[in-house]
């Protein structure tokens, strides 16, 4: 097919998602530093871990959101608290929920974590896993996707992405390698 996709960050995730959702329709995707494609590493945070928290690591230290040359620029908690001031329509963390979360009262997305404590809602994450975790989708559907998808994903990511997007991308690469994908 002559339909090709590319995108960076959120656009990179969209390119990946479209390619794995419509493998017969699309001829290939070239995502760069896509938003998290494996929720075992969501900006560094394992959303599937028991008692997962987006503000604090298991040792109590803050989860960083952005870095430069190895130095933390901002923590997830500080960034999210600024977003709360803007309201439910503004900000990166809210945008993940608008894309991935089921709809709740009034059509708003169900929050994936408590904005006060940082505690992850495992029921919401189960929905995310079922519907939007790209690596999980490949694991579940590779036998049926292989013929139409193999060799069509051309992922590019560095080793120290500013927003920790490299971790999930490398997990996705490992998933693809484990499946024998080209």
Residue ranges of model-derived segments:
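Non-catalytic cap/lid and distal C-terminal segments of serine-dependent acyl enzymes
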Residues: 1-182
